[in-house]
Amino acid sequence: DSSTSRGLGDVYKRQGIVLILSVALAMILANSNIAESYFHFFEQEVGFIVNGEPYLNYSLHHWINDGLMAMFFFVVGLELKREFIGGELADIRNTILPISAAIGGMIVPALIFLSLNIGTPHTMGWGIPMATDIAFALGVVYLLGDKVPVSAKVFLTTLAIVDDLGAVLVIAFFYTSELSIASLLFGLGFLAVMFIGNRLGIKSLFFYAALGIGGVWVTFLLSGIHATIAAVLAAFMIPADAKINESVYLKRMKKLTRRFEHEEANEVRTLEEGQVDVLTHIQHDTEIAIPLLQQLEHKISPIVTFLIMPIFAIANAGISFTDLSLSDIFSTHVALGVTLGLLLGKPIGIIGATFLMVKMRWATLPSAITRRTLLGLGTVSYTHLTLPTILRV
């Protein structure tokens, strides 16, 4: 439906515009008279006191990136599950290409960094240019609205998720000095309970919220692994089927609309009690006819778009240009490795792996994705908010 497409396009454009305005505000604050207060504000530690001891005590910046952004990744996980069930990714063959592209987009930047830093104390920094800032990469694509094919958005989303999973695994196995296996096992246990609940037909929002937040997210946070990965995994445990199916819903609606028609209308603006009762039943049946997965997706998405994403951008995109010049990018092997890894390695790895898979006939490029579209996706994939921080180290 063209009107629906235009409506979604407008939503995506608003998402992108809000994101860009938030980044601009962060830039202004980082280079204003209150820059010091701006940076200090997000470094303040926030936590809980349990028996006089600090518990879950992290900086505000950490809470935003591992806490609030978990909601963003949760929504992304819900969207991905929906695509796996009945969308672009329902055919497993459609996942091979973005997964391969993501792997290529991780390996090439790491190799570029290593080639410039091999034999130096900075060799272990090879993991820095591997990750994509999925939130910003998708924000840029969504800003273009319906000009970007749905298959291209799904391709980038899958690619970015795999990319992020890869980065999390790299951090967990190569950069995490204190990985708590016990906490991780507890987290996996909570995931297993969510999975069993889903298989048993439990549709309670409280059940999944309590286990997802109080169980999976907290234990992953304590384990030392990036807690946003918990959000993606928890999203895949949310039921994708409704309490009543379409045929039952249609039968109930026909019965209720007939009842509504036969209710005697009054001559005032208010409805008769019988009409109100019918509409209440229609509202209830409509709610339970929507799968919990889609209910959560539609309820949380606006919060993520217009509250969480702006906060994330303001907290992370502030770059102070006072002590930063273009020459800094090429001043050290670390900075050069990260810069070239992101700007060249990322798109080369993604596009190269994609063309290789298609050329070898191991995968098929969706018809809506042209070479030009692929080049654009490869280019936007190097969006990365941590680069300025790295350059200052």
Model-derived features: positions:
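Structural signature of hydrophobic alpha-helical transmembrane segments
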Residues: 63-72, 121-135, 178-188
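Entry/N-cap segments of selected transmembrane alpha helices
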Residues: 83-111, 180-189, 323-348, 375-378
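Transmembrane alpha-helix boundary signature
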Residues: 30-40, 78-89, 109-127
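Hydrophobic core segments of alpha-helical transmembrane domains in multi-pass membrane transport
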Residues: 19-30, 74, 109, 190-195, ...
